[in-house]
């Protein structure tokens, strides 16, 4: 199999661009995708995003999290630099932790239409409590829908020991 051809990459504008504009307000239009060259195979793609930041919608105080995004691609895949800039756009976005994770998942579903996706946020404690929202999706009417249900019910059977994120 040969590498990517130039025409396959024409919609990728952020990767390799030294003049990217960092947005400080939520903007899903920054997300870019490319074709999955291995559509006949199920496989996971996982992004570990340890520096996510958003704002509490009530107090305006910053919230910090590590976010884990895993998906089984279908036809499209998310380009990682656009994902980085997209996540950065939450910096001044005021929303609850649970909302942020669901917004991220919904935007990625809209962009890629994956077979399966899960987004797990592990937020640092505020007021002595850490919040770890987990959300997932499997394509309805397929084995991925069943997989999503199973993973949701079993996602935290062995919770980690929280010392001090």
Curated annotation (Swiss-Prot):
One of its GO terms (biological process) is queuosine biosynthetic process. It catalyses: 7-aminomethyl-7-carbaguanine + 2 NADP(+) = 7-cyano-7-deazaguanine + 2 NADPH + 3 H(+). One of its GO terms (molecular function) is preQ1 synthase activity. Pfam families: QueF. InterPro entries: GTP-CH-I_C/QueF, NADPH_dep_7-cyano-7-deazaG_red, QueF, QueF_type1. The active site is at residues 56, 63. GO terms for cellular component: cytoplasm. Keywords: Cytoplasm, NADP, Oxidoreductase, Queuosine biosynthesis. Its main location: cytoplasm. Catalyzes the NADPH-dependent reduction of 7-cyano-7-deazaguanine (preQ0) to 7-aminomethyl-7-deazaguanine (preQ1). This is NADPH-dependent 7-cyano-7-deazaguanine reductase. The gene is queF.
